[in-house]
Amino acid sequence: MTTIKRRDTDFAAYALPVARAQGLLALALWVFAMLLLTAFCAWFEALRAVAVIIFAWWIWSSFYVFRILPQNGRKMLRARGIEYSIGARNHPRLKTLLQKGSTNVGVREPEGYIQKDASDDANYNVRIAGVTPHWIAVGQGATRDLEPPELDCLALRCLVHARLGHVARLDLINRVRQMPSANRVLVWPISLYASLLHALWLAHAESNADRLALLLVKNPKLVMSALLKDFVSHHNLLRAKGVGFDDVETHLKSGGLLEKSGAQMSAQYALGNALREDAAFNARLNALTTWVNSPEYVSALETLA
């Protein structure tokens, strides 16, 4: 037990501190903005009732999004039956990964569920959500089309997010993103916080998850492949152009160079263009590549071996 605890401390130490700093900044700006708005309305006697409403709305929306929605989500997943849960019988590899990975990372083992989107069978989400104990929802498309090591890699990233305390904020961003516009207005204080997190914190949090997942997997090509396939599976324009997982593998093997085949060239061009346009994701890949080629990465592997 002592050895595991010491290893966890060393493991988390390789996360860049900028993510924590930016997360605190987003929280501070959100609290300051809400208190300032409440105080401004309370300053004027005619608006004091509005100030009370704003403050109550802030508390209610926070409780609703951070507590009620996650609890309802867990109940819905549990209600689907044991055939949708990740267990030793139906998904033994993934279940073993969650058990051993949780111990290695130093978090409580999350509940695991297979998620089938009613409107789209090709659901490739691999995400962690909820309040402790967390749960991991894996799309049926991910279990079907991703290579098992790639699915393992994405699941380990979820455990890393849990280790770094990212789950509540990631869940918040995802829930607000999926809400209709009218619902976002109803929880506008939380929508403001989600916007601040997305602008200031999200990219750094994802980059840290990439770094620490790589320390667990110890295979840069596998991590890159998993990240790129996750990117393609959630990029509507690439899917519409027929860019698939085979094109990701071709892209990695060719080092980003265009192939001679017309169909391959078109797919590679579309993928390369999408990567250039998504500055945040491209920066994550570049940062990961830089770190892999650095002495710090080699030293980290030796320390955690």
Question: Model segments located where?
Answer:
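A hydrophobic membrane-anchoring feature enriched in long, contiguous, low-charge segments
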Residues: 39-43, 172-196
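Short, charged cytosolic
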Residues: 1-7, 131-144
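Hydrophobic or amphipathic, alpha-helical segments that drive membrane association/targeting
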Residues: 1-122, 298, 302-305
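Active-site metal-coordination segments of metallo-dependent hydrolases
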Residues: 80-95, 194-215, 275-276
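Catalytic Zn2+-binding segment of zinc metalloproteases
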Residues: 158-178, 220
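Short pre-active-site segment immediately N-terminal to the catalytic Zn-binding motif
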Residues: 138-153, 200
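An active-site-proximal "capping" alpha-helix that borders the catalytic cofactor pocket
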Residues: 98-102, 152, 158, 202-223
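Active-site-proximal gating segments in proteases and membrane effectors
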Residues: 109-133, 184-186, 192-194, 216-305
